[in-house]
């Protein structure tokens, strides 16, 4: 048993290293896409997965899609960008309570998209990713500036 334990530790270390490299490679591939095809949420989730290897990116992409569906329903048949942004704000702010973390701005969890989606708490850049990606999935053209 004394021989097996160090081997398991070694395998675990290598597994963690390979997992991080895989996540970094997926992130690099994501951001190498042309800007029009860039899936900001996927890139942000692969970045988060480097720190959290058990993260299932598809689960969080599905959550963004679910939020987008709710935005589409909230917008209904109302035309125009004001109606679109009102529906987006209604779902993300009023219903889901996404907000800035004013108590602990520098908490690393504010930067990882999975944690922002779990906690509904983030910093301006991570909350912007939520708004942009939910809006995009809901058919609302939003661009960062």
Question: Which role does the model predict for each range below?
Answer:
Residues 1-145:
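A structural boundary/capping signal
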């Amino acid at each position: 048993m004394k021989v097996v334990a160090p081997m398991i530790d070694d395998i675990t270390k290598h597994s963690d290293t390979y997992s991080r490299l895989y996540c970094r490679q997926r992130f690099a591939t994501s951001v190498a896409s042309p800007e029009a095809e860039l899936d900001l949420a996927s890139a942000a989730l692969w970045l988060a997965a480097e720190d959290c290897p058990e993260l299932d990116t598809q689960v969080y992409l599905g959550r963004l899609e679910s939020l987008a569906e709710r935005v589409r329903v909230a917008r209904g048949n109302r035309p125009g960008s004001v109606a679109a942004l009102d529906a987006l704000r209604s779902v993300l702010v009023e219903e889901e309570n996404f907000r800035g973390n004013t108590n602990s701005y520098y908490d690393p969890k504010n930067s990882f998209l999975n944690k922002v989606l779990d906690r509904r708490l983030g910093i301006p850049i991570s909350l912007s990713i939520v708004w942009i990606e939910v809006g995009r999935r809901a058919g609302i053209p939003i661009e960062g500036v």
